[in-house]
Amino acid sequence: MIKTIAKKLSVFVLALSLLLMSAVQFSADSYLVSKDGFYYLIENSEAVIYGYDYNNRTTDIVVPNTISDYPVTKIAPRAFSNNTKLTSISFTDAMSLKSIGKYAFYACSSIEEIIIPGWLNSIGEFAFQDCTSLKNVSIYSNVSVIPEQAFGNCTSLEKINIPSTVKSIGSYAFYNCSALTELTLSKNITDIANGAFYNCPNLTLYGYYDTVAESYAEQNNIPFVHLDKKVISGDVNLDGKIDINDVTLLQRYIAGASVLTDDAVKSADFNKDRIIDVIDVTAIQTFIAHGQN
């Protein structure tokens, strides 16, 4: 009889444990929720995805916009890490999602494509590291930082676009992306950390003159293709040489008789004082007179 009671008690405890898994209260406004294979933390009226049922046979995951009417705003650190069954993840429906945590998709070795939508503001360090099947990444968001090792060791990565909102690329962000052949970097990037493109032997960077990207490429012996035309100081008409025609055009511009493009204005500021005036005219004339074409 004692064995029978003990057995019934064990069954009761197990049933109670499973029941509690679907809603575990942590505080007055914080509890766990399990639904559709996801584990959520409801906190401050927002849902954070913090885990996934690895035994779930679904390989294509769509992150929802809400859970129990609470907006899904974050994917917690390591939420999907080491999920080798996962082949695709979609954020299209998750319009409340603002951030992806550290290691969130670390070593999800079967994912082939990631599309980061415009409403997402931040990506955590190591977020997609070791996603070795990842081929394409499209970033349409307002992220300002590609953090440390975010796409490190994504050995199949062939294509990624980096939006103009990005100002900083962290250390080893793309290390060992051996399949990556080209990447365009905007003028807005102000910092590229050491090793950002370490061991990317097939990479060519595309960008602009006099930028951080150009300097980084030169310092690290990475091929660099310019997307703009080199502006020569004093070449006001942008014909590739400095002569009397530039002086005449600049005089007309100062007199209000001609209009210059942005590049021409940059070239016209010969003494680099950010003022276009007769001093620049004189300086260009002197330059020409000395025969320094």
Give the label of every model feature segment:
Residues G101, P117, G124-A127, Y140, ...:
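Periodic glycine anchor positions in long extracellular repeat architectures
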Residues I2-V13:
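Bacterial N-terminal signal peptides that target proteins for export
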Residues F12-S22:
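Bacterial N-terminal signal peptides
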Residues L20-A28, D228-N293:
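Cellulosome-associated attachment modules in secreted, modular CAZymes
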Residues D29-K35:
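Cleaved targeting-peptide boundary
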Residues G37, I42-E46, N56-K74, T84-S99, ...:
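Structural signature of tandem-repeat unit edges
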Residues P77-A79, G101-Y106, G124-Q129, P147-G152, ...:
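Consensus positions within tandem repeat domains that build extended binding/scaffold surfaces
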